[in-house]
Curated annotation (Swiss-Prot):
Pathway: Phospholipid metabolism; CDP-diacylglycerol biosynthesis; CDP-diacylglycerol from sn-glycerol 3-phosphate: step 1/3. Coiled coil: none annotated. It is a peripheral membrane protein. Transmembrane segments: none annotated. The gene is plsB. The HXXXXD motif is essential for acyltransferase activity and may constitute the binding site for the phosphate moiety of the glycerol-3-phosphate. Pfam families: Acyltransferase, GPAT_C. Its EC number is 2.3.1.15. Keywords: Acyltransferase, Cell inner membrane, Cell membrane, Lipid biosynthesis, Lipid metabolism, Membrane, Phospholipid biosynthesis, Phospholipid metabolism, Transferase. This is Glycerol-3-phosphate acyltransferase.
Length: 807
């Protein structure tokens, strides 16, 4: 290799500086990987390449990593900084042997034998000039831009045409000290290390580019030859008394309606547009947990992303983030309502496949869709779908629609070899464009049909939207889940493949709820959501600025010292910083007062801000319930607080998809936190410290509307034990409307009929709606709920239930 200060390399670096734009994966290798700045470091690359090393040199200078041109000097040892697995491919003839490169591996290992204190980190580095996966029927373009083993001439063309799409990916470091101690330092180990590195680079390329793309028409013909589709076409012909040719044409029409038409060229163009869009809209996008997903891809998992659904922006945001995190954007299941011009064709070429809201018993459509989904899994394409079935209008997670999850489960049961893993994804925003529309719809206005004019209308409103949040939750591997739920599932299916197992539907329901729980476990507590939570807990949606900052400091400390889960993310900075962020986004207003500034939510925005509060209400609902127990009792034993929370938690879990593993332990941790912060003292009982009562009262207010709902339900059950489930839902909803009208409750979810339906299902499951119900339990929970209400609210509920009962 020429010296790094030679005229040739200087010229090459100057050319690349103007032609090449490099994206680093991950963005911060020191934070995301196991790199240790105090230990010597060497790079391992697949192929010796002057242009690759020049590009790497630019990046290492920006990241503060050692330059690939500098020799590795450690403990008196001088070695090359870059180790390659193979030499450059010549324009003509054969590539030289790998012996010189294996010698480098052996030298690095050998010095560890001589110097026991030495530990060199070997960091794999992959470079990609463009990320085209190629096609099954590839053309001359593939020959010109052969990316894996290009000659210098092809590399020049790649830099010229694809230099703006260069990716450099760093991987976790390998300790050569560990390798030397565990496996030795001879040539055999050097060969083994090189083999492992080759496998790593091959897998890494697959993660970055994805599987080859099929020819769409060839894919259709392949699907139509499948056993299940041939059978479905025959049944369609027989049932509708048409020819098989006509039924086949219908199946092709369905495929054309459903199937994606992924275009790498469009994705590259979209990447530029979306970079401009995000920079215009957001001051930053916060990402947590991407490395675990990248590792799942690397380990050969079939990935199914299951995000929550807040906004139409969700379709773009997750794909964009995955692209920049070194993964292939997934094929996205989009509602057929989005298949309008020009968005529909663009979404389709960006990887969207379209699904009808209802299959309406259409067996042929069902068979076509199922076969297409199976094919995506079989070929290794990652998939994304929204299990809620639509965008949440309240900010809370919706009850999951199980159709897509059931189809995914069925694909596993039909024999996918690779592990299929669901990755729950929490998507959050400091500003959701559609919030105002959502509240119009909740108040009875008809939902507008999606159209190009809505797109233009949305573009006109683009502004400062603060930050976005993408948190990847705990993955669920379906084969492991099935082993847990039905240990003999493989044997059962082998014995009778056509028989639907009795455990399948309950297992799908449990899986769907676990996905939603894992989404909420990965929630992002941001400046907007936290400030909304505090201000909406006050009577006038306003608070003195210093008190607001103090309350936010309490919440931030709580989330950090008693973390809800390890997947949850918490805003950086203190309460003062969070308030300032919210004011800069115009979410809140501040007015001067002789005694100090007051921060408030404008009356016209109060209902809209409940959306953001609801994004994270589950993080604080148990601490809020604990605070309510403390503030409504002068003294209360610790165990009584634990018991009250245990009574309400099953309902909270059903309503808010909560995932606290050990509820008593969590309650005790929160109580210990309150004591540590000086809010509460404990002798034989727990007592609130008077000067901190206001902080606990504010926290307690966040659970008040939830307790009012439970008080309505349990007062009705206590007065009318024989009440049917449907009757309980309708009566609870009517009483909620009455309570809201009398006490000014405006939160949309308080009147949500579906919420009362969810609670009634859980009540039946817990035995509170059964004929042999334990009335003492119902009366106890009723009394607990009543004791935690304001007297006026309690009086309204008790009087209304009694009056209704006497009527």
């Amino acid at each position: 290799m020429p010296k790094h200060d030679s005229l040739w390399l200087k010229s090459l670096r100057w050319i690349q500086k103007h032609l090449v734009h490099t994206i680093v994966v991950p963005q911060d290798p020191f934070a995301d990987l196991n790199l240790d700045a105090s230990r010597p470091l060497a790079y391992v690359m697949k192929t010796e390449s002057l242009s690759d090393i020049a590009a790497l040199s630019e990046i290492t200078a920006k990241l503060g990593l050692p330059s690939p041109y500098e020799p590795l000097v450690a403990n008196g040892v001088i070695a090359p900084r870059v180790v390659c697995l193979q030499g450059r491919k010549p324009l003509f003839g054969e590539r030289a042997g790998n012996e010189p490169f294996l010698e480098c591996f052996m030298r690095l290992l050998a010095v560890h034998k001589e110097r026991p204190e030495l530990d060199i980190q070997l960091v794999p580095v992959s470079l990609y000039w463009g990320r085209t996966p190629g096609k099954e029927d590839d053309t001359m373009k593939a020959a010109v831009f052969e990316r894996e083993n290009p000659t210098w001439l092809r590399k020049c063309l790649m830099i010229l045409f694809l230099g703006r799409h260069n990716f450099v990916q760093f991987s976790n470091a390998v300790s050569l000290r560990y390798m030397a101690d565990e496996h030795g330092t001879d040539m055999g180990i050097a060969h083994k290390l090189a083999r492992v590195a080759r496998v790593h680079f091959r897998r890494q390329r697959k993660v970055m580019t994805g599987p080859v793309l099929p020819n769409r028409q060839a894919l259709f013909h392949s699907l139509l030859k499948s056993e299940s589709l041939r059978k479905a076409i025959q049944e369609e012909a027989a049932n509708k008394k048409i020819s098989e040719t006509q039924a086949r044409e219908t199946a092709i029409e369905y495929l054309d309606e459903i199937a994606a038409d992924y275009s790498d060229s469009l994705v590259r163009i979209a990447e530029r547009f979306l970079t401009w869009l995000w920079n215009k809209l957001y001051s930053g996008i916060n990402i947590k947990g991407a490395e675990q997903v990248r590792q799942l891809h690397h380990d050969g998992h079939e990935i199914v992303y299951v995000p929550c659904h807040r906004s139409h922006m969700d379709y773009l945001l997750l794909s964009y983030i995955l692209y920049y995190q070194g993964m292939v954007p997934p094929h996205i299941a989009a509602g057929i309502n989005l298949n309008f011009w020009p968005a529909g064709p663009m979404f389709r070429r960006g990887g969207a496949f379209f699904i009808r809201r209802s299959f309406n018993g259409n067996k042929l459509y069902t068979a076509v869709f199922r076969e297409y989904l199976d094919q995506l899994f079989a070929k290794g394409y990652s998939v994304e779908y929204f299990s809620e079935g639509g965008r949440s209008r309240t900010g809370r997670l919706l009850a999951p629609k199980t159709g897509m999850i059931a189809m995914t489960m069925n694909s596993v049961l039909r024999g996918i070899e690779r592990p299929v893993t669901l990755v729950p994804v929490y998507l959050g925003y400091d500003h959701v464009m559609e919030v105002a529309t959502y509240h119009k719809e909740l108040s009875g206005k008809k939902k507008k049909k999606e159209s190009v004019w809505q797109v233009f209308g949305a573009i006109r409103k683009l502004g400062n939207f603060g930050q976005g949040y993408v948190n990847f939750g705990e993955p669920i591997t379906l084969q492991n889940f099935l082993n847990e739920r039905a240990p003999n599932w493989r044997t059962e299916l082998a014995d009778d493949p056509e028989q639907k197992p009795s455990w399948l539907t309950p297992a799908v329901n449990v899986l769907a709820n676990r996905v939603m729980t894992n989404i909420n476990d990965a929630a992002a507590a941001s400046s907007v959501t936290l400030t909304s939570l505090v201000l909406l807990a006050t009577d006038q949606n306003a608070l003195e600025r210093s008190l607001l900052e103090r309350q936010l400091d309490l919440y931030l400390t709580l989330l950090k010292k008693v973390p809800y889960t390890t997947y949850t993310s918490v805003a950086e900075g203190d309460g003062k910083h969070l308030v300032q962020q919210g004011l800069e986004l115009n979410k809140f207003v501040v007015c001067a007062d002789p005694l100090g500034e007051i921060v408030s939510i404008e009356a016209s925005q109060a209902v809209s801000m409940t959306y953001y509060r609801n994004n994270i209400i589950h993080l604080f609902i148990v601490p809020s319930l604990i605070a309510s127990c403390l503030t409504h009792n002068k003294q209360i034993p610790r165990q009584q607080v634990v018991s009250i929370v245990a009574d309400f938690y099953p309902l909270l879990k059903a309503e808010l998809f909560m995932g606290i593993k050990d509820v008593p332990a969590y309650v005790n941790q929160v109580l210990d936190f309150f004591i540590e912060q000086g809010l509460v003292v404990e002798t034989d009982t727990l007592t609130v410290v008077p000067e901190h009562t206001s902080q606990l009262l504010l926290l307690a207010s966040s659970v008040s509307e939830t307790l009012q709902r439970y008080a309505i339900i349990f007062n009705l059950l206590a007065n009318r034990p024989k009440m049917e489930r449907s009757e309980l839902e309708s009566e609870s909803h009517l009483l909620a409307q009455r309570l809201g009208a009398l006490h000014g409750i405006t939160a949309p979810e308080f009147y949500d009929k579906k919420l009362y339906g969810t609670l009634s299902v859980k009540l039946k499951e817990l035995g509170y709606l059964a004929d042999n119900q334990d009335k003492s339990n119902i009366n106890r929970i009723r009394d607990q709920a009543n004791s935690l209400l304001r007297p006026s609210v309690k009086q309204t509920i008790v009087a209304s239930v009694t009056a209704e009962h006497t009527v």
